[in-house]
Amino acid sequence: MIVLTKENILSYIKEHVPSLELKEPIKVSMIGDGDLGEDVEGDGYCNYVFRVSDTEGHSYIVKQSTEHLKRRGRALTPTRNRFEYEIMELRAKIVPQYVPALYLGDPENNVFIMEDVSNLKLIRFQMNKNHLFPELAKQGAQYLAATHFYTSEFYLPTEEYRKLLTHFMNAELRVVMEDGIFLQIFGSDHYDAACGPEFEEYCKSIRFDPNLEFQRYKLRHLFMSKSETLIHGDFHTSNIFADDTHLKVIDMEYTFGAPFSYDLGFIIANIISQACSAAFRPFDMETHRKNYVAYLISLIEMLYTYYIQFFFEYWEKDAKLEYKITNGYKESLAL
């Protein structure tokens, strides 16, 4: 397997995708190393991600996975790159407007090449600057509702659905979420001490509350055992590029079968975090703070409302007849 670097990536592109439009001078940058600024530094934490561009507006993202994660000590199978390419292909057939275009899938070298969407901005950093995204709730909800419904058994033939779940079992990466989200919470890492001893003790008092432990293990079991659809798995504000009218979703390597509600809950948790940050960081006027926090809170409600709206639209159009004619089934999904 070739390991891509800034020095050899152009020869790799010329050999594998000679039709890709690039004209000298060509610039190669590595995402995640601070080469491009925070507005486009969305990926590159676990993988090697390059931006290759020229001065005439052609720009591409080249992503390679290796066994050893870029910024973590643990090892994961590099075939996650192939799974990500395959799920992007599938989701591009469902919601092409929200998925970057794909130009190459190379499973031998665990590489794929896709559209550079950095003409948009990562919403995490823009929210830190108090930016509003008027279409985020509607577009984000449509992306989730469509990709969830059309990879569920409500739509797919049962055999095809089971094959899809088996193919995207993703045994190694799902453990990252099963443990990282439900077990390794605040107070379990030495970095938490940076917040100060009083805050650390306060958080530990919550973490070790018996009822909380009971509830999170219940949720973990539900997450592990209820495979309703192929989730994104890592749908948060650093994996969504947007502007006032467009949205693109990246970093889909964590896809596997799980409950419908997980992705929606994950992005809502991120927005709650943004609202907490906005409640305490400096604003030029207190009314601006209140307005921005109110916007973030309303975003949570709108995401859920639009998700249900779109999901029900797809249900009415394409759900299997046996589900459609079962009185109350559709409505029960929103409870």
Question: Where in this protein do the model-derived segments appear?
Answer:
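Active-site acidic catalytic loop and adjacent metal/ATP-binding pocket
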Residues: E38-D54, Y60-V62, R216-Y262
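Conserved NTP-binding catalytic cores of kinases and kinase-like/nucleotidyltransferase enzymes
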Residues: M1-N110, D244-L247
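Short helix/strand-bridging catalytic loops that position acidic/His residues to coordinate divalent metals
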Residues: R71-G73, I123-F133, V249-F256, D284-N291
